Amino acid sequence: MNPKLVKQAVAFAAEFSEQNNERIVVLVNEQNETTEVRPYLGDNFSYEQFLNALIINYSDGKKFIDIDSINSIHCYKQKI
């Protein structure tokens, strides 16, 4: 996995979220496993290269570290 591309994908997701009133769904494909939908809606998240993980900082102060092997990140506009 290319850390630079993942960082760019996370930055794109954050910008895409802002442009669409934070109505996005982030779809994370895990290595040789099922696909999960993780709605990091309105939460601050970033890619940590050293951990190879997504760090999600929830608005209530809790933190989630997604350490699954990430193959790709796709952003979809959520239908309201």
Label the model's feature ranges.
Residues 1-63, 69-80:
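Eukaryotic intrinsically disordered, low-complexity regulatory linkers and tails enriched in Ser/Thr/Pro
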